[in-house]
């Protein structure tokens, strides 16, 4: 036998009999299982603890950022549950946005701890049924009808913010005074166009003092009623002299601190988006009422808002159209200023679908004051 053969023989590894190996395998599996199962259990616990920590950290940040305080521990647990449910809905919608199935994103905002019906009761204060009833019963509730200007070609886009005609985004708080903010916004724009001076006007003046004109303070009102009050009253006070409180208070209008006045208002033909675009382009910001009754509006963040469930007759929220345009995908939109603060939407604004059969009723009740 050669040296190689000797080497192979001397150093050949010992082998176990087949039956011995068969006995060893179950023992090895049992030992490995005994080691792995506790490790897996620890890992699962660690992940669960980690997830719970993340959730509570998000909740803590939310409460801190939006200054949330609850009556007791029971209410806080209830609000945390709503917060987590809303977060799940938002994440689900945004996954559809990432897949290109919807044209706008949602985000957690200060309303994330509210049930949707609570949110609607608190924030949406426009009554379209009352609007129609008043106009049908009395001609004085109707304004001058808008007539298209001659020889005007509509621009591709308009943004009155860049022209200095729009005040900073305001916050109505937990008060259904959207109609007052829409009214002041339109008059602020018209006053600026006439005087060249942008003056922030008092929503609280309208909340407190225009009840005889059919408005109901924090429980809702109509922009046209506000314009009628301002005309008959000889003006509206400045925001600085009559600051916002987000409650119904006694009227303390002061003629010495009037910021602007009007001499009536103009109504744009119902449902006519083309005429409304002409008014926005040539006149300035326009008061409108919309259907804002959907959760998608509550948590809107960016993109062109396209809500197929919107109703052109179910109008419950007053806002201000400050421009229009077309986005990079070719979608026409209205540029709308809301009154829910800068943490809502796109820094307080929303792009709403334009030229799509009057979606959300944006052209159903539009008007602006005459100055």
UniProtKB/Swiss-Prot annotation:
One of its GO terms (molecular function) is cysteine-type endopeptidase activity. SMART domains: Inhibitor_I29 (SM00848), Pept_C1 (SM00645). Its EC number is 3.4.22.15. Keywords: Developmental protein, Digestion, Disulfide bond, Glycoprotein, Hydrolase, Lysosome, Protease, Signal, Thiol protease, Zymogen. Residues 1-48 form the signal peptide. The active site is at 178, 317, 338. In the embryo, predominantly expressed in the midgut. Also expressed in larval alimentary organs such as salivary gland and midgut including gastric caeca. Pfam families: Inhibitor_I29, Peptidase_C1. InterPro entries: Papain-like_cys_pep_sf, Pept_asp_AS, Pept_cys_AS, Pept_his_AS, Peptidase_C1A, Peptidase_C1A_C, Peptidase_C1A_papain-like, Prot_inhib_I29. Disruption phenotype: Flies exhibit wing and pigmentation defects. Females are sterile, males are partially sterile. Disulfide bonds join 175-218, 209-251, 310-360. PANTHER family: CYSTEINE PROTEASE FAMILY C1-RELATED (PTHR12411). Dimer of a heavy and a light chain linked by disulfide bonds. Belongs to the peptidase C1 family. This is Cathepsin L1. It comes from Drosophila melanogaster (Fruit fly). The gene is CtsL1.
């Amino acid at each position: 036998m050669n040296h190689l053969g000797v080497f192979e023989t001397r150093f050949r590894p010992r082998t176990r009999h087949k039956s011995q190996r068969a006995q060893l395998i179950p023992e090895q599996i049992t030992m490995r299982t005994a080691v792995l199962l506790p490790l897996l259990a620890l890992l699962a616990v660690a992940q669960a603890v980690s997830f719970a920590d993340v959730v509570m950290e998000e909740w803590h940040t939310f409460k801190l950022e939006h200054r949330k305080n609850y009556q007791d521990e029971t209410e806080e647990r209830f609000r945390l549950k709503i917060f987590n449910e809303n977060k799940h809905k938002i994440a689900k919608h945004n996954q559809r946005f990432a897949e290109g199935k919807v044209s706008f994103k949602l985000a957690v905002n200060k309303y994330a701890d509210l049930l949707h019906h609570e949110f609607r009761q608190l924030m949406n204060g426009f009554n379209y049924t009352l609007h129609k009833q008043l106009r049908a019963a009395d001609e004085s509730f109707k304004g001058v009808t808008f007539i298209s200007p001659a020889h005007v070609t509509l621009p591709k886009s308009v943004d009155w913010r860049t022209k200095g005609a729009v005040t900073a985004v305001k916050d109505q708080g937990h008060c259904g005074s959207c109609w007052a903010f829409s009214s002041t916004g339109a008059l602020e724009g018209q006053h600026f166009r006439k005087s060249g001076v942008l003056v922030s006007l008092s929503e609280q003046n309208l909340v407190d003092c225009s009840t005889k004109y059919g408005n109901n303070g924090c429980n809702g009102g109509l922009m046209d009623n506000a314009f009628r009050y301002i005309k008959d009253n000889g003006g509206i006070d400045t925001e600085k002299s009559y600051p916002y409180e987000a409650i119904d208070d006694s009227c303390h209008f002061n003629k010495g601190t009037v910021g602007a006045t009007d001499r009536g208002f103009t109504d744009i033909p119902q449902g006519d988006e083309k005429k409304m675009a002409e008014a926005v382009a040539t006149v300035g910001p326009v008061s409108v009422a919309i259907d804002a009754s959907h959760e998608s509006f509550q948590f809107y963040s960016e993109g062109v808002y396209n809500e197929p469930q919107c109703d052109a007759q179910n109008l419950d929220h007053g806002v201000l159209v400050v421009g229009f345009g077309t986005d990079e995908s070719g979608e026409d939109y209205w540029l709308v200023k809301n009154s829910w603060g800068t943490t809502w939407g796109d820094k307080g604004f929303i792009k709403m679908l334009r030229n799509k059969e009057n979606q959300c009723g944006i052209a159903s009740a539009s008007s602006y004051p005459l100055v």
